[in-house]
C-alpha cells in the first residue's frame, strides 16, 4: 500500500485535473504470467492474483510473486489489472465504485475458458478483500482455495496512514474522516471509503456504506443467505495476518477480528459479529477457515513460508520436491576473475575477525534469517506452524530471500525506498537518513550539468561502477537480509547504501590528498572530512537499526566502497597522466557541451571565479 500522500495526489489529479472521461468504468483484464514451462499442457488449476493498493501486476514484486507461484504449482497464473495501463490500474485502487469493478472482473472470468473448471486465488492486501467479494457474489468465480495476505476483511477505521512528520497529510485525512467519509459521492468513488468502518459512528456506517455492510452481512439484504452459502463452497479460506501490520488499521481486521475502539483491546474473530453473520463459525467447524499470523509488518514474510502456503493450498498434486530456478548469475569472466577472489577475501576476513573475537557475532546467515525476532526454523516450526514444516521439508525450497532481477536491484540500489513508520518519529528519522545517498546523487547531477567538469563526471562514473560491483557481489554471495526486512527486497551482503557512502567518503578524502595535498591538513579540510564521515555514520546506522541489514553487511559494504573509492582516485589520476582525459575532451560530444577539466589543475577555483565575477560587476557599474 502507498502512503496517504499518494492517496491525496491521485485523488486530486484524477478527479480535478484529468478529463471527464475518467468517470467511465475502467477496462479490466487478466494478464497471464508466462514462463519457460508448458503451462498449457498442465492439468493443474490456475491461480488468479489480485494485487494491493498502489501496486500493479507488472511491478517488480508482483511479477516475482506471480512467477514464483507458477514455478511452484507448474500451472497458469493470471493477475487482475483494472485499466488499460499501469497508471489506470493504480488509480482504480484508489478511485472507483467497487461493485462496478467486481462486476467487470466477474464477466471477464466467466469469459476465460481456462478458469471455467475452477481456480485458486491469492489476494494481497485489499486485493484479498476483493477476491472474497468475488467468491461471494460472482457465480463464474469458482474459487477452490483463497489465500489473503494482510487483507482488511472486517474493514479499516482509518485511511492508510501518513508519516508522523507529514502534518498536512494528517490534517487532510482528519478532515475527510470527520466531515465527508459518509457522503454518497465519497462512498461511491473512493475505494478505501467503501470498506471504512468505525463503531464510533456505527449507525452512519450501517446507513451509508453499501459495500462492506452487505459483503459482511452486517445489515439485512437480498443476498444475505447467498453470501454465507457461497463462502461454504470454498475448500479453504486462509486469512494471513501480520502482528505488526502498520498499514491495515486495526490489524486484527485481517483475521476477521476487530478492536475495541474505546479500550484498544483486541476482539478475536470468535467474539466479533462476522463470526455469526457471515457463517465463519460453520467454516471453522468444517475445517475450511484458517487464520495464520506472522510476526512481521504488512506483507512481510519469508519466501519459505510463502512457498509453504502455496504448496499446501494451491498445488493439485503434492510432489516430493519442488525446486525454483536460480537467479541470473554473473558471467563466467566476472565470476572467475573478480567475484570469486572478492568473495573469498570477504569470507576469509570474516573468519579472521571472528577468530580475533572482533566480530563474535559471525553468523550463519540462513539460520539467522529463520530465527531472528521469532521467525521459526523448520525444526521448531512444527510447534508453532505445524502445517508449514511438512511442506518446507517436502519442497526443499530455499529459505533465502528470493532473487531479484537486475532492474529491480538497480532501482532499489540507486533510488531505493523506505517505509514510513506510523507514530514512530525515531524510525521515520532513521528512514530519512537512508535517503542521504539519493540527495548526494541529486547533487552529483546538479554539479555535472552546471559545472561541466570532467572530473565530476569521472567521480559519478565511479559511483555507478561501485553500484554494479555491489550488485555482482550480492547475487554471488546470496546472503539474505534480516527476517524483519519488508517482503521481497533482495539480498543483503553487502549493503549498497553503506558501499555508496564508503566510496563517496574515500573519493572525496583521497582526491583532496592527491590534488590539494598542501591544504588537506588544514582545519577546514578536517571539518569537511568530519562531515563526510558523519553522513556515512548516519546512513550506515540507519540501515542496521531499521533492520535492513545485519551489522556485518553494513561494515563490509562500507569497507568495499571505501576500497573502490581509493582505487578510483588512483585510476582517474593514471588516466589523466596517460593523456586519456585530454583525448576525451577532444571528442566532439564533450566539446559541444563545453566539458572541461580545470578543477585538478587550479587551486582556489571557486574563489578565483568569485573574484572575477566581482571585478566584472565593478567594471560594468563604472
Curated annotation (Swiss-Prot):
GO terms for cellular component: endoplasmic reticulum; endoplasmic reticulum membrane; vacuole. It is found in: Vacuole; Endoplasmic reticulum membrane. Residues 427-428, 512-519, 574-622 are cytoplasmic. The chain crosses the membrane at residues 406-426, 429-449, 489-511, 520-540, 553-573. Glycans are attached at residues 223, 260, 396. Disulfide bonds join 106-138. The active site is at 125, 245, 298. Proteolytically cleaved, possibly by krp1. It catalyses: S-hexadecanoyl-L-cysteinyl-[protein] + H2O = L-cysteinyl-[protein] + hexadecanoate + H(+); a di-trans,poly-cis-dolichyl diphosphate + H2O = a di-trans,poly-cis-dolichyl phosphate + phosphate + H(+). GO terms for molecular function: dolichyldiphosphatase activity; palmitoyl-(protein) hydrolase activity. Its EC number is 3.1.2.22, 3.6.1.43. The keyword Oxidoreductase does not apply. Disruption phenotype: Cells show lethality and the dolichyldiphosphatase domain alone can rescue the lethal phenotype, but the growth rate of these cells is slower than in wild-type cells. Cells containing wild-type palmitoyl-protein thioesterase (PPT) and inactivated dolichyldiphosphatase reverse the growth retardation phenotype. Cells containing no functional copy of palmitoyl-protein thioesterase are viable, but abnormally sensitive to sodium orthovanadate and elevated external pH. Keywords: Disulfide bond, Endoplasmic reticulum, Glycoprotein, Hydrolase, Membrane, Signal, Transmembrane, Transmembrane helix, Vacuole. The record marks 373 as: Crucial for post-translational processing. One of its GO terms (biological process) is protein N-linked glycosylation. Residues 1-24 form the signal peptide. Residues 25-405, 450-488, 541-552 are lumenal. It is a multi-pass membrane protein. Pfam families: Palm_thioest, PAP2. In the N-terminal section; belongs to the palmitoyl-protein thioesterase family. In the C-terminal section; belongs to the dolichyldiphosphatase family. Essential protein. Removes thioester-linked fatty acyl groups such as palmitate from modified cysteine residues in proteins or peptides during vacuolar degradation. Required for efficient N-glycosylation. Necessary for maintaining optimal levels of dolichol-linked oligosaccharides. This is Palmitoyl-protein thioesterase-dolichyl pyrophosphate phosphatase fusion 1. It comes from Schizosaccharomyces pombe (strain 972 / ATCC 24843). The lineage of its organism: Eukaryota, Fungi, Dikarya, Ascomycota, Taphrinomycotina. The gene is pdf1.
Amino acid at each position: 500500500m502507498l502512503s496517504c500522500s499518494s492517496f491525496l495526489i491521485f485523488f486530486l489529479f484524477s478527479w480535478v485535473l484529468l478529463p471527464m472521461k475518467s468517470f467511465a468504468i475502467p477496462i479490466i483484464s487478466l494478464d497471464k504470467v508466462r514462463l519457460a514451462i508448458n503451462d498449457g499442457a498442465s492439468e493443474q488449476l490456475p491461480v488468479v492474483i489480485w494485487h494491493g493498493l498502489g501496486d500493479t501486476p507488472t511491478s517488480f514484486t508482483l511479477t516475482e510473486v506471480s512467477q514464483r507461484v507458477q514455478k511452484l504449482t507448474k500451472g497458469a497464473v493470471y493477475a487482475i489489472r483494472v485499466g488499460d495501463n499501469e497508471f489506470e490500474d493504480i488509480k482504480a485502487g484508489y478511485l472507483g465504485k467497487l461493485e462496478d469493478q467486481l462486476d467487470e472482473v466477474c464477466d471477464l472470468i466467466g469469459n476465460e475458458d481456462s478458469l471455467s473448471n475452477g481456480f485458486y486465488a491469492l489476494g494481497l492486501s485489499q486485493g484479498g478483500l476483493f477476491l472474497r467479494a468475488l467468491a461471494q457474489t460472482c457465480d463464474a468465480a469458482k474459487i477452490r482455495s483463497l489465500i489473503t495476505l494482510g487483507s482488511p476483511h472486517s474493514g479499516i477505521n482509518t485511511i492508510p496512514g501518513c508519516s508522523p512528520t507529514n502534518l498536512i497529510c494528517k490534517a487532510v485525512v482528519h478532515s475527510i474522516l470527520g466531515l465527508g467519509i459518509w457522503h454518497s459521492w465519497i462512498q461511491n468513488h473512493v475505494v478505501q471509503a467503501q470498506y471504512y468502518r468505525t463503531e464510533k459512528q456505527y449507525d452512519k456506517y450501517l446507513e451509508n456504506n453499501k459495500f462492506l455492510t452487505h459483503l459482511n452481512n452486517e445489515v439485512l439484504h437480498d443476498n444475505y443467505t447467498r453470501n454465507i452459502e457461497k463462502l461454504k463452497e470454498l475448500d479453504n479460506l486462509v486469512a494471513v495476518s501480520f502482528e505488526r501490520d502498520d498499514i491495515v488499521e486495526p490489524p486484527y481486521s485481517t483475521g476477521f477480528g476487530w478492536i475495541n475502539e474505546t479500550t484498544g483491546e483486541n476482539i478475536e474473530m470468535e467474539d466479533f459479529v462476522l463470526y455469526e453473520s457471515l457463517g465463519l463459525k460453520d467454516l471453522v467447524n468444517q475445517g475450511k477457515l484458517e487464520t495464520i499470523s506472522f510476526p512481521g509488518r504488512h506483507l512481510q514474510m519469508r519466501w519459505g513460508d510463502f512457498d509453504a502456503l502455496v504448496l499446501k493450498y494451491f498445488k493439485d498434486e503434492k510432489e516430493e520436491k519442488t525446486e525454483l530456478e536460480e537467479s541470473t548469475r554473473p558471467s563466467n569472466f566476472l565470476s572467475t576473475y573478480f567475484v570469486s577472489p572478492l568473495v573469498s577475501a570477504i569470507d576469509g576476513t570474516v573468519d579472521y575477525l571472528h577468530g580475533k573475537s572482533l566480530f563474535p557475532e559471525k553468523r550463519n546467515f540462513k539460520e539467522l534469517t529463520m530465527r531472528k525476532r521469532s521467525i521459526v526454523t523448520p525444526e521448531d516450526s512444527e510447534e508453532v506452524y505445524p502445517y508449514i514444516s511438512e511442506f518446507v521439508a517436502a519442497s526443499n525450497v530455499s529459505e533465502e530471500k528470493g532473487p531479484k532481477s537486475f532492474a529491480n536491484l538497480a532501482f532499489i540500489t540507486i533510488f531505493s525506498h523506505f517505509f514510513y513508520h506510523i507514530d514512530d518519529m525515531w524510525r521515520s528519522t532513521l528512514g530519512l537518513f537512508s535517503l542521504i545517498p539519493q540527495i548526494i546523487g541529486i547533487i552529483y547531477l546538479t554539479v555535472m550539468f552546471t559545472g561541466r567538469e570532467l572530473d565530476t563526471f569521472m567521480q559519478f562514473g565511479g559511483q555507478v561502477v561501485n553500484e554494479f560491483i555491489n550488485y555482482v557481489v550480492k547475487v554471488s554471495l546470496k546472503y539474505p537480509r534480516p527476517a524483519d526486512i519488508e517482503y521481497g527486497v533482495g539480498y543483503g551482503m553487502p549493503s549498497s547504501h553503506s558501499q555508496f557512502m564508503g566510496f563517496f567518503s574515500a573519493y572525496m578524502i583521497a582526491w583532496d590528498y592527491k590534488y590539494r595535498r598542501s591544504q588537506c591538513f588544514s582545519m577546514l579540510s578536517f571539518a569537511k572530512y568530519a562531515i563526510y564521515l558523519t553522513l556515512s555514520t548516519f546512513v550506515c546506522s540507519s540501515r542496521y537499526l531499521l533492520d535492513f541489514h545485519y551489522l556485518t553487511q553494513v561494515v563490509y559494504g562500507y569497507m568495499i566502497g571505501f576500497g573502490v573509492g581509493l582505487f578510483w582516485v588512483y585510476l582517474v589520476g593514471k588516466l589523466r597522466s596517460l593523456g586519456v582525459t585530454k583525448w576525451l575532451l577532444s571528442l566532439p560530444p564533450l566539446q559541444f557541451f563545453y566539458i572541461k577539466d580545470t578543477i585538478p589543475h587550479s587551486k582556489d577555483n571557486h574563489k578565483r571565479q568569485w573574484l572575477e565575477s566581482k571585478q566584472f560587476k565593478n567594471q560594468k557599474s563604472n
